[in-house]
């Protein structure tokens, strides 16, 4: 799969393509740092960082565009290879420690590995169906946006439902946000200089995706601050008062 075939690119875009390459590297640093940080955080605190359903959707997306519709551009292929391998580590920690977070739901707790397998299989089938319907290039981009929205919403909901910040940190949030935010400028440049092949970037759906990403991921930072403030208050309440 060649997401952005530069042989089709107009000269105006080729003049600024270096900007998109720099942004891709920023994206890679952000997301790879996020994956490494999630693995380390999960092992240290014996939990998992990414919400269950977004994790399965994201892993399925990585799997689909690593094995079934692989990238042809060397830089993108190498970045995606590292991302997939690290995502395997994220998935391992989720399976290894996930049951600790589901004591309130014994059915889920006992069957978590099966739930992960079924969810990943379902999401892979969805990504493949979308790619076959609309073509891998467009499907890769649009389904990637959908993964991001699900991840942003799922992360915020996970914080609210758990009521604690184990598995979460400002560094993980900022790395993820930076990695995704870095792709906005390349999309703007493609829409401005290479519009024929990137009409979807100016569509109402893409604008909605962008707005929801900024709102949901921005909200995550506020919710994390609120949860941590509540944790500090609980610690103070639990401390015995000195007579």
UniProtKB/Swiss-Prot annotation:
One Gene Ontology cellular component annotation held by this UniProt entry: membrane
Annotated GO biological process: terpenoid biosynthetic process
GO molecular function, one term: lyase activity
Primary localization: membrane
Transmembrane intervals: 16-36, 50-70, 79-99, 112-132, 141-161, 172-189, 207-227
Biotechnology: Diterpenoid pyrones display various biological activities and subglutinol A shows insecticidal and anti-HIV activities.
Membrane topology: Multi-pass membrane protein
Keyword Transmembrane helix attached: yes
Domain of life according to the entry: Eukaryota
Pfam family, one: Pyr4-TMTC
Keywords for this protein: Lyase, Membrane, Transmembrane, Transmembrane helix
Subcellular location per the Swiss-Prot or TrEMBL entry: Membrane
Membrane among keywords: yes
Disulfide bonds: none
EC number: 4.2.3.-
Pathway field: Secondary metabolite biosynthesis; terpenoid biosynthesis
Task of the protein: Terpene cyclase; part of the gene cluster that mediates the biosynthesis of the diterpenoid pyrones subglutinols A and B. The first step of the pathway is the synthesis of the alpha-pyrone moiety by the polyketide synthase dpasA via condensation of one acetyl-CoA starter unit with 3 malonyl-CoA units and 2 methylations. The alpha-pyrone is then combined with geranylgeranyl pyrophosphate (GGPP) formed by the GGPP synthase dpasD through the action of the prenyltransferase dpasC to yield a linear alpha-pyrone diterpenoid.
Similarity annotation: Belongs to the paxB family.
Name of the protein in its database record: Terpene cyclase dpasB
Organism whose genome encodes this protein: Apiospora sacchari
Lineage: Eukaryota, Fungi, Dikarya, Ascomycota, Pezizomycotina
């Amino acid at each position: 799969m060649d997401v952005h075939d530069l042989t089709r690119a107009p000269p105006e875009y080729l003049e600024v393509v270096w900007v998109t390459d720099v942004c891709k590297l920023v994206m890679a640093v952000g997301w790879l740092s996020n994956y490494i940080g999630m693995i380390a955080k999960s092992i240290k605190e014996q939990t998992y960082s990414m919400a269950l359903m977004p994790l399965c959707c994201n892993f399925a997306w990585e799997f689909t565009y690593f094995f079934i519709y692989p990238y042809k551009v060397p830089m993108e292929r190498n970045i995606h290879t590292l991302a997939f391998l690290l995502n395997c580590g994220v998935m391992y920690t989720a399976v290894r420690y996930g049951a600790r977070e589901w004591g309130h739901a014994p059915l889920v707790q006992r069957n978590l590995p099966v739930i992960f397998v079924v969810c990943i299989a379902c999401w892979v089938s969805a990504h493949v169906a979308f790619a076959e319907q609309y073509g891998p290039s467009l499907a890769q981009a649009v389904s990637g946006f959908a993964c991001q929205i699900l991840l942003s919403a799922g992360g915020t909901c996970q914080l609210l439902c758990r009521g604690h910040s184990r598995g979460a940190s400002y560094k993980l949030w900022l790395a993820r946000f930076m990695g995704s935010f870095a792709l906005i400028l390349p999309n703007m440049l493609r829409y401005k200089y290479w519009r024929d092949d990137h009409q979807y970037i100016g569509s109402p759906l893409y604008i909605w995706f962008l707005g929801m990403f900024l709102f949901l991921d921005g909200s995550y930072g506020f919710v994390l601050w609120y949860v941590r403030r509540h944790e500090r208050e609980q610690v103070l309440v639990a401390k015995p008062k000195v007579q």
